[in-house]
Amino acid sequence: MDIGLQMVFTGYGWKEISDQQVWDEELKIAEIAADSGFDCLWAVEHHFRDYAFCPDNLQLMAYLTAKHPEIDVGTAAVILPWQDPLRVAEKASALDQLSNGRLRLGVGRGLARREFDGFRTTMAESRERFDEAAAMIMESLRSGWMESEGPHYIQPKVEIRPRPRFPIDGRIYAVASSEDSVVSAAKLRARMVMFADRPWPKRLPQIQQHAQLFEEMHGVPGPPPLTADFCVCTSTMDGAEEFSREYMGTFVYSNFEHYELLGDHFSKVKGYDSYAAKIEVAKEVGIEGIIDGFMQAAVWGTPDRILREFEKRRAIIGDFELATSFRFGGTPYEVAEKSIKLFAKEVLPVLKSWKEPEAKQAAE
């Protein structure tokens, strides 16, 4: 099984924490992951607010690939409607050169109105821009050339330099939290990325849809998804549920605040109507109900309990890759460090013994 670290770069939930401390703590945890046998370092792209602030994950990965030469690096994800497709392709190709093919390129379309406003763009165009830009980028990393006649991106034919050296297929990831994003991921030949934020039986239809579409479009089995997780690993169960709920609950609150999830704007924006329906459900169950669902999806407690939860997940959704975060929702650094070290000692070796999915090999 492939296990990565998810780097969130969040300051929400801590009192009087500086941006420097946020970054220092994330980089320390990344070093532990790299030294402990994790397979990949993943980083988000977010801007402007305490929720998360990693404005250029490709730039970050250029640093991490030099500092940690034995581990893959990944973007989860580059938000394409805020980018120029040519610049993304060039930076990805350059990073692949520096890392000798260790880049995993994850892409997404964005959800926070505040971030779209900051980049002087509109959520209403995000689906079209994502689909157009993603196709341009992936094709250019296959062929070495980029050209497009729009409608959103008019790009004269240019060569990608440094020329792509390594096949990109098998290393493409796409965030898929809505039904149309599942279709887009399948078209891209991308592994689907989904967050551990609701009970896994509710995720199964999307996973099955992606697998079916992938095989119909490309003639090979679709790769298992990457689940982006949140973890609190403890030596005993004494108090584990209480403080796990504290940190995970704070992270849930940060999502509601950052994404304005109780607002009515999703129903008015093209391409986000599926979120409006989910928000109505959220209003019915309330914030505590949402936290309950998050706690069911994420993993917490002793290594034995965490392994049992992963086994239950695999029984529901099948094989999956993992990218888990240990620092979120006000988690003190000492707690996050103990958590990842115990996870690396007791959980990681067992997960790595799980057989690698045949679908992954076929996709590559």
Language model feature labels by segment:
Residues F9-D24, V78-L86, F166-A176, F294-P303:
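Active-site mouth loops of central-metabolism enzymes
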Residues C40-M61, I79, D197-W200, S325-A336:
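Glycine-rich, proline-tolerant flexible connector loops at the mouths of alpha/beta enzymes
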